[in-house]
Regions:
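FIC/Doc superfamily catalytic core
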Residues: 1-171
């Protein structure tokens, strides 16, 4: 007689946010992140107000729903191989939809890395001051330009996942 072991959850399973509160909180976090990046990044635009701000928030919510919510009965766990695939999808749609007047690449990259860290799957890439040697810069540029496939970009995140065993980790 053969015993069947229960299937364990994938250690890097996609996040599922099917409640409205979580999705709204995540969208607000993106908006706050974008605002902060614009202030510290010496950008030429300021935060959107009025109708433009509402439009941006709605577009962010749409991208996040596509990445993190069940759609037509299909869970993110059914659509994405793992969380790395999921955040690459999210970053691709956020940056290519050009939601904000400025800072789309920065916001998309930093938020994707933040989601990975929140999910205890932090990624560390080379952060060289030279853009051509900076893996973060190359990753987002390749995402925007289509130089590499989304699967290749997700694989790079997967390869650079780091495990920290103490609570005082730098990530």
């Amino acid at each position: 007689m053969t015993a069947v072991a229960p299937r364990r959850a994938h250690p890097f399973a996609p996040l599922v946010l099917d409640d409205t509160g979580s999705l709204e909180a995540m969208a607000e976090a993106v908006m706050r992140l974008h605002s902060t990046l614009m202030k510290v990044g010496r950008c030429y635009t300021t935060d959107a107000t009025g109708d433009r701000a509402a439009l941006e928030l709605g577009r962010v919510e749409s991208v996040l729903a596509g990445a993190f919510c069940t759609i037509f009965g299909q869970s993110p766990a059914d659509r994405f191989a793992d969380i790395f695939d999921q955040v690459t999808y999210m970053a691709e749609h956020m940056v290519k939809d050009h939601i904000f007047e400025d800072g789309n690449k920065r916001t998309s990259l930093v938020f994707a890395l933040s989601v990975l860290r929140f999910a205890s799957t932090p990624v560390v890439l080379s952060d060289s001051p030279e853009p051509k040697d900076n893996q973060y810069y190359v990753w987002i540029q390749d995402l925007v330009s289509g130089n590499r496939s989304r699967a290749d970009l997700a694989e790079e995140l997967r390869r650079n996942y780091v495990v920290y065993h103490d609570c005082a980790s730098p990530v």
